[in-house]
């Protein structure tokens, strides 16, 4: 019998190393090997065993052909690239099924009975597991890419691409990623010309903060209309404001008048930052030229996207995801919809015409401004968006609701899952009868959220409301060639 305390522990069942939380032995084909053995290693290591010629990356760099470097990077960034897309979907579907089986098993232990899950029988589950929804596009699907600056295998510090190696082993290099299946040509082109800019710049890149240097990472965002936004991060170190301005002009001239003009950027941003990652509030994005926002047409809405606003990286796949969320939510004219971790507000806005009222909550202030603009531009009048931490805003918002409208909650948190106070607020709000939980990493901290939502009432943890019941699950593939997918879960009570 499983130990529920182990499952509930942060260091427990689903936080083991590896990508999938189980071990099913040694099936014969590659896709089954990925399923069965990733628990002890990774998809990359399993694939490598099928190709003995690729040796394990060593601390001391050894001479290696370009194609081998490219394969190594592909194995890290897109571990499933060697499989057909049909085989990839099989791997992902089985992953979600195993996860849900484990979840149901542990819920049964916690309750001592099986009444915490629905009565359906599907794929060995009591909840209804739908077939995985494939991505409409499988190549070049990313609408946002982040490129690092570091030393190439030949030692050139002005190289733009993705990291390969580990800092612990001291073998990190930076490799161009134009060969990766999920990167659009436009993103690779902008990265290539940023590298050209760096190599002709008199200012050194910032590889490690304590080593000095200035030029840092590049972010590229695109939409389906072909518009391109680039964001360059710069560490000022000891430069004066005037010296920083000179570098901004140099960068702008390169992409407007110089070789980089071929990229045809719609907008170019500059962020001066002394931190690894920071928000617009901490260090404002400075528009060097072009449009301040990028726009996307989605589900009949014109969506505005700011430089640091969250937007699903697979636009075509996101449309399918949002339709499924809307269908599962069952929102109607009597419903109040809470869109928690709403980003630019697309989920709430897309179902607003069916709901009585929509409240969206998002941490990133720029994203909230985008959501408000999108609502106004599209004539949506029954949506309100709130900027701040969900664990602070949600309890206050629920207390302010004086009527007894049936409340539907949709949560789409980051990989870290929901804050405990948010889970507690949802659990203890007796008007919330339907919850749609969207997770891009259901085997991580989100699993803890599922347990807290469905476990028996616990006064010590202030989980006093009736437990939710897992009814349906829909895997949606937004990340072809990687082991990840979105899992949409419907809970009711």
UniProtKB/Swiss-Prot annotation:
SUPFAM superfamilies: S-adenosyl-L-methionine-dependent methyltransferases. It catalyses: uridine(54) in tRNA + S-adenosyl-L-methionine = 5-methyluridine(54) in tRNA + S-adenosyl-L-homocysteine + H(+); a uridine in 12S rRNA + S-adenosyl-L-methionine = a 5-methyluridine in 12S rRNA + S-adenosyl-L-homocysteine + H(+). GO terms for cellular component: mitochondrial matrix; mitochondrion. It holds the Pfam family Methyltransf_31. Its EC number is 2.1.1.35, 2.1.1.-. Residues 1-14 form a transit peptide. The keyword Acyltransferase does not apply. One of its GO terms (biological process) is tRNA processing. Disulfide bonds: none annotated. Keywords: Methyltransferase, Mitochondrion, rRNA processing, S-adenosyl-L-methionine, Transferase, Transit peptide, tRNA processing. S-adenosyl-L-methionine binds at residues 312, 362, 412. Transmembrane segments: none annotated. Its main location: mitochondrion. The keyword rRNA processing applies. Mitochondrial S-adenosyl-L-methionine-dependent methyltransferase that catalyzes the formation of 5-methyl-uridine in tRNAs and 12S rRNA. Catalyzes the methylation of uridine at position 54 (m5U54) in all tRNAs. Specifically methylates the uridine in position 425 of 12S rRNA (m5U425). Does not affect RNA stability or mitochondrial translation. Belongs to the class I-like SAM-binding methyltransferase superfamily. RNA M5U methyltransferase family. PANTHER family: TRNA (URACIL-5-)-METHYLTRANSFERASE, TRNA (URACIL-5-)-METHYLTRANSFERASE HOMOLOG B. This is tRNA (uracil-5-)-methyltransferase homolog B. It comes from Mus musculus. The gene is Trmt2b.
């Amino acid at each position: 019998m499983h130990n529920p305390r182990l499952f509930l522990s942060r260091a427990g069942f689903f936080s083991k190393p590896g990508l999938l939380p189980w071990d099913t032995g040694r099936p014969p084909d590659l896709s089954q090997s990925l399923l069965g053995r990733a628990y002890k290693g990774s998809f990359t290591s399993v694939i490598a065993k099928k190709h003995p010629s690729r040796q394990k990356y060593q601390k001391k760099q050894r001479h290696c052909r370009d194609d081998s470097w490219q394969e190594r990077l592909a194995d890290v960034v897109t571990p499933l690239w060697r499989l057909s897309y049909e085989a990839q979907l099989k791997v992902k579907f089985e992953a979600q099924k195993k996860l849900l089986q484990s979840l149901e098993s542990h819920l049964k232990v916690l309750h001592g009975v099986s009444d915490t899950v629905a009565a359906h029988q599907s794929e060995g589950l009591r909840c209804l597991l739908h077939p995985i929804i494939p991505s409409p596009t499988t190549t070049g699907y990313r609408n946002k890419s982040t490129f690092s600056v570091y030393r190439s295998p030949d030692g050139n510090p002005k190289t733009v691409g993705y990291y390969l190696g580990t800092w612990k082993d001291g073998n990190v290099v930076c490799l161009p990623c134009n060969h990766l299946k999920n990167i659009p040509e436009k993103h690779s082109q902008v990265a290539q010309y940023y590298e050209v800019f760096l190599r002709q710049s008199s200012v050194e890149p910032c590889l490690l903060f304590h080593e000095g240097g200035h030029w840092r990472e590049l972010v590229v965002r695109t939409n389906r209309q072909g518009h391109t936004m680039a964001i360059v991060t710069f560490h000022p170190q000891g430069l004066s404001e005037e010296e920083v301005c000179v570098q901004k002009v140099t960068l702008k001239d390169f992409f407007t008048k110089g070789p980089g003009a071929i990229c045809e950027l719609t907008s170019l941003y500059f962020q001066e930052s002394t931190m690894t990652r920071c928000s617009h509030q901490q260090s404002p994005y400075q528009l060097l030229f072009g449009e301040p926002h990028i726009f996307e047409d989605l589900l009949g809405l014109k969506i505005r996207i700011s430089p640091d606003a969250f937007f699903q990286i697979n636009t075509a796949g996101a449309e399918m995801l949002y339709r499924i969320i809307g269908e599962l939510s069952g929102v109607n004219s009597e419903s109040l919809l809470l869109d928690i971790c709403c980003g630019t507000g697309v989920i709430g806005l897309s179902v607003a015409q069916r709901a009585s009222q929509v409240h969206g909550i998002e941490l990133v202030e720029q994203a909230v401004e985008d959501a408000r603009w999108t609502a106004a531009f599209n004539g949506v009048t029954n949506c309100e968006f709130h900027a701040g931490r969900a664990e602070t805003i949600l309890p206050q918002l629920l207390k302010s609701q004086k009527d007894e409208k049936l409340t539907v909650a949709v949560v789409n948190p980051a990989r870290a899952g929901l804050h405990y106070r948010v889970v507690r607020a949802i659990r203890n709000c007796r008007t919330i009868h339907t919850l749609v939980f969207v997770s891009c990493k259901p085997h991580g901290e989100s699993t803890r959220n599922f347990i807290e939502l469905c476990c028996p009432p616990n006064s010590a943890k202030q989980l006093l409301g009736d437990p939710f019941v897992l009814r349906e699950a829909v895997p949606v593939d937004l990340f072809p060639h990687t082991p990840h997918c979105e899992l949409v879960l419907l809970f009711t009570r």
